[in-house]
């Protein structure tokens, strides 16, 4: 969970055709992946489909380049399914929206780093819980087909399922996996997410059945999110304590080990203050001590419309870019 606010800034450039498999950029970091979410194309979710440049925006490629130069090697690119396929989950694409999304993805992978496609829909489509796994499988077969030749693309099944039947969450994730592989996208990682906003601190209580997911390519990564404020929602600059980061990922770490799985913290953040800096460092240090199961983490969030949002990692003036990057720097490549 996280708070979202809208501000205006520049957009990414025009699209080009999806590239062939890219060479991965070489780097030196304790983690396989460390990076940021790139927010904007999911904004204005109460005004769908909305107007590009008014209700939503695409990430600024030059800002992403700055973060790559700082050592980041993975970017989770948010979008709304209703804008990509406005008629139905199995329907035709809005070609302009797809083109803009593809432009950002290509810019990231052309730099030799990973781009995550994140349908930021919370397990819903047009406000209704997605209850038909076969339609979701078709959605993912179609979308993965657009990027199946690009090995640096990662498919994130859906952002933060919540308040849903647990078996349905499992089945939707499995349907996504099946659709992606059916499309011929066999080299790419798939990030799966759980119920209860995919929280690491509630994972073992809520999402134990997710261990039953199957992928013929064995490239599933369990994506969890973790914020450090009192309710774990990511809506406050305050962190509970300097140790709360490590505390909230400990049980999930053991679950990954017990079930021989690997995971990533797909969203995390803390306020620009000493206690949160200590808590963030403590969590990342703990993840770094357990890289057999934790493959990295992504900050929430960069994006051109964040303005003075408390967690903004957008160069050059984002609150976290100027105030938290020194903490993150130790883990960057």
UniProtKB/Swiss-Prot annotation:
Reactions performed catalytically = Endohydrolysis of (1->4)-beta-D-glucosidic linkages in cellulose, lichenin and cereal beta-D-glucans
Q: Which residues form a coiled coil?
A: none
EC top class, in one word? hydrolase
Q: Where in the cell is it found?
A: Secreted
Output a single Gene Ontology CC term carried by this record. extracellular region
Superkingdom to which the source organism belongs: Eukaryota
- Active site, per annotation: 160, 267
* Annotated GO biological process: cellulose catabolic process
Q: Give one Pfam family, short name only.
A: Cellulase
Q: Cross-referenced InterPro entries, in alphabetical order?
A: Glyco_hydro_5 (IPR001547), Glycoside_hydrolase_SF (IPR017853)
Q: What is this protein called?
A: Probable endo-beta-1,4-glucanase B
